[in-house]
């Protein structure tokens, strides 16, 4: 049986991590006192700020570097980052939204079959590893896409990569390898 080309796999993006700079120094104490939905952590030297729409959490450092997590698309990450910059501007900081980039994307996908992990790692030995004592998934690294795929025996996979395109390409690349190691129903 050949892996059919018309199989539609739903790739669900669950987390997008992005970074941007404000190009100005930020007083964390002021943000902690005046901001809404903030947690000031002076021992770490950062402020956590949460937005409700889009639902993101931002780590704000006094240097002006901000890391946003929790978005479910690259567009939502950019919208949330711009909204965060606007909140800081309203507090009186001379914020300029710059150097925005998506640094990490986490997605999940479910294969329509179960997978024999030991056979999968034996077939793809140099780039696949499986340590059942440490973690229930096999790890498969795709260097040219800078992506890592975690393969579970149930057929569920989690993919981390630098952007949504590389995550989708990683799923396309690994599907034939998983198909040949699928469990047959008895």
UniProtKB/Swiss-Prot annotation:
Query: Biological process GO annotation list?
Result: DNA-templated transcription initiation; embryo development ending in birth or egg hatching; transcription by RNA polymerase II
Q: Which UniProt keywords apply?
A: Cytoplasm, Developmental protein, DNA-binding, Nucleus, Transcription, Transcription regulation
The record's Pfam families line, in alphabetical order, gives:
TBP
Which species is this UniProt entry from?
A: Danio rerio (Zebrafish)
Task: Check the record and name the SUPFAM superfamilies matching this protein.
Answer: TATA-box binding protein-like
Q: Which family does it belong to?
A: Belongs to the TBP family.
The molecular function terms of the Gene Ontology recorded here are: DNA binding; general transcription initiation factor activity
Which protein, by its recorded name, is this? TATA box-binding protein-like 1
Biological role stated in the UniProt entry: Part of a specialized transcription system that mediates the transcription of most ribosomal proteins through the 5'-TCT-3' motif which is a core promoter element at these genes. Seems to also mediate the transcription of NF1. Does not bind the TATA box. Members of the TBP family are differentially required to regulate transcription and development during early embryogenesis.
Q: Gene3D superfamilies recorded for this chain? A: TATA-Binding Protein
- Compartment(s) where it occurs, according to its Swiss-Prot or TrEMBL record: Cytoplasm; Nucleus
List the GO cellular component terms: cytoplasm; nucleus
Primary location recorded for the protein, binned into one broad class: cytoplasm
């Amino acid at each position: 049986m050949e892996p059919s080309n018309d199989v539609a796999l739903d790739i669900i993006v669950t987390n997008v991590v992005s970074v941007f700079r404000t190009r100005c120094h930020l007083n964390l104490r002021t943000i902690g006192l005046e901001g809404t939905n903030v947690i000031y952590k002076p021992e770490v030297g950062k402020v956590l700020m949460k937005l409700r729409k889009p639902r993101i959490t931002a780590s704000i450092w006094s240097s002006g570097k901000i890391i946003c997590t929790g978005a479910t698309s690259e567009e939502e990450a950019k919208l949330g980052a711009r909204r965060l910059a606007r909140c800081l501007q309203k507090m009186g900081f001379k914020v300029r939204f710059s150097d925005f980039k998506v640094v990490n994307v986490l997605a999940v996908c479910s294969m329509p079959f179960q997978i024999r992990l030991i056979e999968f790692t034996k077939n793809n030995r140099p780039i696949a590893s499986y340590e059942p004592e440490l973690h229930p998934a096999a790890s498969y690294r795709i260097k040219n896409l800078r992506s890592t795929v975690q393969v579970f025996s149930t057929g569920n996979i989690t993919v981390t990569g630098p952007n949504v395109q590389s995550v989708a390409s990683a799923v396309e690349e690994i599907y034939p390898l998983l198909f040949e190691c699928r469990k047959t129903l008895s």
